[in-house]
C-alpha cells in the first residue's frame, strides 16, 4: 500500500479497503509533502541501511537516501496513485462501548485467532461483562476463544476483521460506536486507529 507524508510530524494512512485509518505523531518533522507508492518496499530499503539520512528532492520528485558512503535515489509517486486519507479528522462521539485493552490481552487474542484460523474478532457485552473473542461469525460451530476485558450493563456484539486489528503493539483505550466506527488510542505513544466494524455488528443497549 502507498502512503502520503505531509509536512510536519503527523503521519496518517488509510487501508486499501478504506476501513482502517491510522495516525501517529513522530519525533522527526518532514519539511515537505511526499508520497511513497509501495510503503513496504520503502521500509525494507530504509531498515537495510545503517543510520540513513533522507533528503526530499521536490524538483526531481525523488528521495536521496545517504548511508555512510552510499547513496540511493528513490522515486516518489503522485498523490493520485494512492488512496489518501481524508483531510478531515474522524470523531467517535457518544460511543456506547468503552474499555481498556491491554497489550497482553490483545496479543493473546491475535495469537489464538491465528492458531485456530479464525477470521473475526468480536467485542461482546452480555449484560455483565465485556469480552474480546476470536471467532468465525459465519460459522456458529467454529472454535472460539475469549478474554474478559471489562464490565457492562449492556448487550452488544461488535465484529471486526482480524486483519484490521493488527496494530502497533501496546495497550489501547477503545471506544466503539453503534454507528459502525471504533477508535483505538495507544495508552503511551501518540498512535491512534479508527476501524470500521463489520456487517452483523449490533448494539441492543
Residue spans for each PLM region:
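Long, charge-dense
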Residues: 77-99
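DNA polymerase processivity clamps
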Residues: 1-76, 95-205
Amino acid at each position: 500500500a502507498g502512503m502520503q507524508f505531509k509536512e510536519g510530524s503527523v503521519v496518517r494512512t488509510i487501508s486499501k479497503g478504506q476501513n482502517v485509518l491510522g495516525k501517529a505523531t513522530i519525533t522527526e518533522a518532514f519539511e515537505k509533502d511526499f508520497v511513497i507508492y509501495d510503503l513496504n518496499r520503502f521500509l525494507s530499503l530504509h531498515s537495510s541501511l545503517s543510520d540513513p539520512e533522507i533528503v526530499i528532492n521536490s524538483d526531481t520528485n525523488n528521495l536521496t537516501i545517504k548511508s555512510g558512503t552510499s547513496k540511493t535515489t528513490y522515486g516518489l509517486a503522485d498523490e493520485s496513485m494512492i488512496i489518501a486519507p481524508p483531510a478531515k479528522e474522524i470523531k467517535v462521539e457518544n460511543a456506547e462501548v468503552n474499555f481498556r485493552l491491554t497489550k497482553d490481552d490483545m496479543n493473546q487474542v491475535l495469537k489464538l485467532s491465528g492458531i485456530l484460523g479464525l477470521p473475526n474478532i468480536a467485542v461482546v457485552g452480555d449484560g455483565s461483562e465485556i469480552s474480546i473473542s476470536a471467532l468465525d461469525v459465519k460459522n456458529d460451530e467454529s472454535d472460539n476463544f475469549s478474554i474478559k476485558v471489562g464490565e457492562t450493563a449492556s448487550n452488544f456484539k461488535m465484529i471486526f476483521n482480524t486483519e484490521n486489528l493488527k496494530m502497533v503493539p501496546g495497550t489501547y483505550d477503545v471506544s466503539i460506536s453503534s454507528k459502525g466506527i471504533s477508535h483505538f488510542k495507544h495508552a503511551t505513544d501518540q498512535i491512534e486507529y479508527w476501524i470500521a466494524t463489520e456487517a452483523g455488528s449490533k448494539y441492543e443497549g
